[in-house]
Amino acid sequence: MTDYKATLNLPSTAFPMKAGLPQREPEILQRWNSIDLYRKLRQIGEGRPKFILHDGPPYANGNIHIGHAVNKVIKDMIVRSRTLAGFDAPYVPGWDCHGLPIEHKVETTFGKNQPADLTRERCRAYAAEQIEGQKADFIRLGVLGDWDNPYKTMDFANEAGEIRALAKMVEGGFVFKGLKPVNWCFDCGSALAEAEVEYQDKKSDAIDVAFDVEDADKLAAAFGLASLAKRASIVIWTTTPWTIPANQALNVHPEFVYALVDTGERLLVLAEELVESCLQRYGLAGEIIARCEGKALELIRFRHPFYERFAPVYLADYVETGAGTGIVHSAPAYGEDDFRSCKHYGMENDDILGPVQSNGVYVSDLPFFGGQFIWKANPAIVEKLAEVGALLKHESIQHSYMHCWRHKTPLIYRATAQWFVGMDKVAHDGSSLRRRALDAIEQTEFVPAWGQARLHGMIAGRPDWCISRQRTWGVPIPFFLHKESGELHPRTVELMEQVAQRVEQGGIEAWSKLDAAELLGDEAAQYEKITDTLDVWFDSGTTHWHVMRGSHPMGHEQGPRADLYLEGSDQHRGWFHSSLLTGAAIDGHAPYKGLLTHGFTVDENGRKMSKSLGNVIAPQEITDSMGADILRLWVSATDYSGEMAVSKQILQRSADAYRRIRNTARFLLSNLDGFDPAQHMAPNDQLIALDRWAIDRALLLQREIEEAYTTYKFWNVYQKVHNFCVQELGGFYLDIIKDRQYTTGADSLPRRSCQTALYHIAEALVRWIAPILAFTAEEIWQYLPGERNESVMLNTWYEGLAELPEGFELGRPFWDKVMEVKAAVNKELENQRNAKAIGGNLQAEVTLYAEESLAGELARLGSELRFVLITSAVDIAPLAQAPAEAVDSELAGLKLLVRKTEHSKCGRCWHHLPDVGSHAEHPEICGRCVENIEGAGEVRHYA
């Protein structure tokens, strides 16, 4: 038997079938490094339109987790796709370095009592060490960026830039000192930002407390009575007994109806709609003897249960009747609403009682409870209320309560003297920061769109921003306050610039070492140099000022507004929020044109990642076992607008999809063996019809892919690429062309036409996947034929794809119909194989009984229809002639009849044909193969 293998164009490539990503990816990283890819991208980007994605800095503490990986991969997909779209898209990674978590870590290691300068030195060293670890992990994910020059908020230039940003806000009239309740953590010993507060369930003491009336005549008059016949009390309900020693007022809603209830022993004032539930709670019977609106109770005084002072009634719209009594006890030092209400009624700061110290302990001279920690004092306060006859009910309730994000301990609101950025303070230009920020939101594009309403609601309802902290490791607030008046030095902005210049040279330590006399001269004795530091959200929130336009070597190129900020959805109250406020204050607009948010990672059951649940998947595990490209493919395939489910099983599905894409690329490469595009590319107008369709289909797909990348719908890119590889290529085109590719002459037009199409598709495909499968695309790039530059990323979207001309004989609708017919035939062939009626498809001869229009369409392929259906023979007959044994197909107007061929198998092309054995010199092969070996070669037009 003759071996015809040498006469076939069998596929061949050195591109490995097995990816081996954990081993191969580090080699590709080394290659990118050796060719200085990032710098080359900046060089070729000169003169291109810019696209700036400004990096929200992760905190420089601990290993990266899967959420970090998701964030950086999405950013990288955007930067890479914008680069391929012809933009200059630099990416400067950053780190957030100051703040309590690092200071806490250093204190845990070295103790709390070390000198402040030593603490700062150790914090700086610790942050630098953490950055190196995180940086290595981000690079391993394939994230392309300026890793040699990242920005760090602890860089001296950035610390100085932050002071300059603060000076701009002082100059604009937005910064003031005030006494206000702020979120306070006893363990931190400092105020916390809103973004540092999380809510957990907490068990609390809920108490109903009676305040006896002092102005009995006024209370009687309010209820339309001549006098009160017995002891009368107003009742409050609270879950914070520890605030009772700080009570200074009582709040009622001006429009609610309040009832005077006779319970026998005493009269109680309660909101009318809560009377029944309150009496039931107290185990009392009673009847309403009078009613009045809340506004009638204004300024009537009641006695504190155990201190010799009075609590007047103030009107407040925030009072609700969802629980409690409809009356709120007001401790202005420990509640935002309470504080506002008391200030509205003229209470001076000096009159506000604040018996709780920064460590949560009452001042020592507080009667009854001095020196006690507030949480431990609760039982004693309840006991005291019972002792004086003021306690009507005590029970324990479970409710959601604010906790420190770091220590997981309960927080309180605590009025302290702090520095604030005023939301409603009218700036020098007559506008408020709140108005500026809300206007800026309207000018910002949000992905997903619901982010706009969310951020708008947060800005509309937020209090003034407390920017001061009482910590060591942070950028100083370099203010000098007059010792008598408490006012800022009149040259504050000028002095801040002088401090910034010193910090630029010596870091934040320059402020702690500074002698006030160096700047103030003889005035120094009159001024106090403050020691507060800035909220870390001010650090990251001003990077648009001191990184995008300042400290970074690329800063001047980036300008005042980034095209995009991209972080997790929690950053609406974090980095997006603080950046918006500082941008609106300094520049009058947001520092970003667009905001993109992604959801959090959960396991396959929708549960939060947690060590206790054992469902945590570290990105390092994925890169070590499966490769970064598998993680990147999973990110691309997942709709990030909601929760992002990840598990080993889900990642395995991504690995399976990866293999299908890789195998498609390998098929393309192996069939381009020996193809030199400079010599062998067939002209477009000479290409076989099916090849022209394949190129046209790739062009249409590329347009859809470009649109999906532009709108950040990476899951659409994934689906389109995967479906193209599996269905249109793997399930249709590549299957059909194998015969032509392998059996026609090596340099024949049918084969070169096919290779031309494969080449165009490969050139396009490698670019489509480059933003997602960064490593694999680079690997494919090295195996593609023809002259090319060093990296796929040094190119733009492929421009060699040609559209089918209008009126082309076999256009898109034609091939869509052919695919449907092929799917119907494949289904019946599979049935026949399963029934053992045929072996392979080439043992089959098919008759298509088709209605007239379909028959006419299929007939256009002539004898080449069999190559499309991959059977040895195809006949077309009228649908009306279909015999009883013909099988219905899912395609209307088509029936099928498959029969096993009686002809011999060609030993070269494996088709079963009547002329096999008719050629004396080649008795084992068909006439077509003889022509392809010895003659001019077969002619193909369509397939």
Swiss-Prot record:
Keywords tagged on the record: Aminoacyl-tRNA synthetase, ATP-binding, Cytoplasm, Ligase, Metal-binding, Nucleotide-binding, Protein biosynthesis, Zinc
UniProt short sequence motif 'KMSKS' region, positions renumbered to this chain: 608-612
Binding site for L-isoleucyl-5'-AMP: E567
UniProt record, GO biological process: isoleucyl-tRNA aminoacylation
Highest taxon in the source lineage: Bacteria
Cofactor, how bound (note): Binds 1 zinc ion per subunit.
GO MF annotations, alphabetized: aminoacyl-tRNA deacylase activity; ATP binding; isoleucine-tRNA ligase activity; tRNA binding; zinc ion binding
Top-level EC class as recorded in UniProt: ligase
Entry GO CC: cytosol
UniProt-annotated location(s): Cytoplasm
Principal subcellular localization: cytoplasm
Domain notes: IleRS has two distinct active sites: one for aminoacylation and one for editing. The misactivated valine is translocated from the active site to the editing site, which sterically excludes the correctly activated isoleucine. The single editing site contains two valyl binding pockets, one specific for each substrate (Val-AMP or Val-tRNA(Ile)).
Family classification: Belongs to the class-I aminoacyl-tRNA synthetase family. IleS type 1 subfamily.
Protein's recorded name: Isoleucine--tRNA ligase
Species classification: Bacteria, Pseudomonadati, Pseudomonadota, Gammaproteobacteria, Pseudomonadales
Gene encoding the protein: ileS
